[in-house]
A protein has these predicted regions:
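C-terminal and late-domain segments of enzyme folds
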Residues: 1-26, 32-48, 133-209
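General beta-strand structural signal in soluble alpha/beta enzymes
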Residues: 6, 63, 85-86, 117-120, ...
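Short beta->alpha connector loops
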Residues: 9-14, 66-69, 101
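Portal/gating segments that form or line small-molecule/metal binding sites
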Residues: 37-99
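Short, well-ordered alpha-helix to beta-strand connector turns
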Residues: 58, 81, 114, 154-155, ...
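Catalytic-core regions built around general acid/base machinery
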Residues: 77, 101-114
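Catalytic nucleophile loop
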Residues: 85-88, 111-129
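Short, active-site-adjacent cap segments at secondary-structure transitions
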Residues: 92, 124-127, 194-196
Length: 209
């Protein structure tokens, strides 16, 4: 069964995700992929918050990057892992490294074969068929990417951090102007929400305040 849990902010929703997975998180090995944070400048407390949120609810977690890796590395390093968590940061950098390494193809096959995928922010966005609807936000890596197909794990795209004051300008001035088209299947998530996916069925869940 295909299972995904796509969050806006995993530090807030980790307990809900763990409950929905339905197994003792201490018995689940998780790869915490922080690749998207590599080009980000300034304070990265949010990265620590996401990692610590998952650790707090009990996941057996280790850090991992897909940068400079190959499919053979993933087969060796991640084959026995129960959950692949792809965290936030720069979605375009993440996509570029996924393309270079072959992670995009490897993760599609792995999820189809039953490996659980969790995402936060950029890690949720990239699960979509295509990320071009957010490309006005950041022109970095466009030339290298050329096309903007995501992992294609779901048939919609997550817009995270809805209602968060720090993202208000990017939504009002860029993202909504690009995305406001009938062909775009978009799910807006605030930081207490996540989408849980089982095969072709999905629903929005929300953790209480």
């Amino acid at each position: 069964m295909k299972k995904l849990y796509l969050a806006s902010s995993i530090d807030v929703t980790a307990a809900g995700v763990a409950k929905d997975i339905g197994k003792d998180p201490k018995r689940l090995r998780m790869a915490f992929i922080s690749t998207a944070a590599e080009p980000e400048k300034g304070n990265k407390d949010w990265l620590d918050d996401d990692r610590n949120g998952l650790i707090k609810v009990g996941f057996d977690l280790f850090d991992y990057t897909i940068t400079d890796k190959t499919v053979k590395d993933f087969q060796n390093d991640l084959q026995g892992v129960d959950i692949i968590h792809v965290n936030g940061g720069n979605t375009f950098y993440l996509l570029l490294q996924a393309r270079k390494s072959g992670f995009d193809k490897w993760i599609r096959e792995s999820v189809e074969n039953g490996k659980i995928y969790t995402g936060s922010s950029a890690g949720s966005i990239i699960a979509s068929p295509d990320i071009k609807v957010i490309k006005n936000l950041d022109k970095s890596y466009w030339k290298e990417l050329k096309t903007f197909e995501g992992f294609g794990l779901v048939d919609f795209i997550i817009f995270p951090h809805w209602g968060n004051k720090y993202f208000k300008s990017s939504y009002l001035n860029h993202r909504l102007k690009t995305a406001y088209k009938p062909e775009n299947k978009i799910i807006l998530l605030n930081d207490r929400q996540y989408v849980k996916v089982e095969n072709d069925m999905y629903q929005i869940a929300e953790v209480p305040l």
